[in-house]
Regions:
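Exposed beta-sheet edge and beta->alpha loop/turn motif
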Residues: 87-130
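Short, low-complexity N-terminal intrinsically disordered segments enriched in polar/charged residues
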Residues: 16-41
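Short solvent-exposed beta->alpha transition segments
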Residues: 29-30, 34, 45-97
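Sec-dependent N-terminal signal peptides
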Residues: 4-13
Length: 130
């Protein structure tokens, strides 16, 4: 009986020490949140750099994208008194299309909330917005 208890205790310790692997969809979800947090804090260039086309965009178009992000935040400020925070909700992996849908919750200053889906793809080892 004592040997069985020791074996059970040993197995429990080994199982408890098992390294927990972080799922790719969890990494993609956190990356999406970071991109939108950067946008929220006025780092428009970092947000645009998180888009799939960032390495092929001509400088003039990149500036237009940055201007669009500024206008978007201005519109949200006008309609909802701005975005208070972005929360990461969940992520769903689509193995057929090789992407992850990251579900974020925008919490506005007027107390309304909006759920947003951000399609994410992995490119060169980093998760970026599609």
């Amino acid at each position: 009986m004592r040997k069985a208890f020791i074996l059970l205790a040993f197995c429990s310790i080994i199982a408890g020490c098992k390294k927990e692997e972080i799922k790719p969809e969890e990494v993609a979800l956190q990356a999406a949140k970071v991109y939108y947090d950067q946008l929220l804090h006025g780092d428009y260039a970092a947000f645009v750099d998180g888009m799939n086309m960032n390495d092929t965009v001509v400088p003039a178009y990149r500036e237009q994208l940055i201007t669009n992000m500024k206008m978007y935040l201005g519109q949200q400020k006008k309609e909802h008194m701005g975005i208070k925070e972005v929360k990461a909700l969940r992520a769903v992996r689509d193995s057929v299309n090789n992407k992850v849908d990251a579900f974020l919750l925008f919490c506005f200053n007027d107390s309304t909330k909006e759920q947003v889906v951000v399609p994410m793809i992995e490119k060169d080892g980093a998760w970026i917005m599609r």
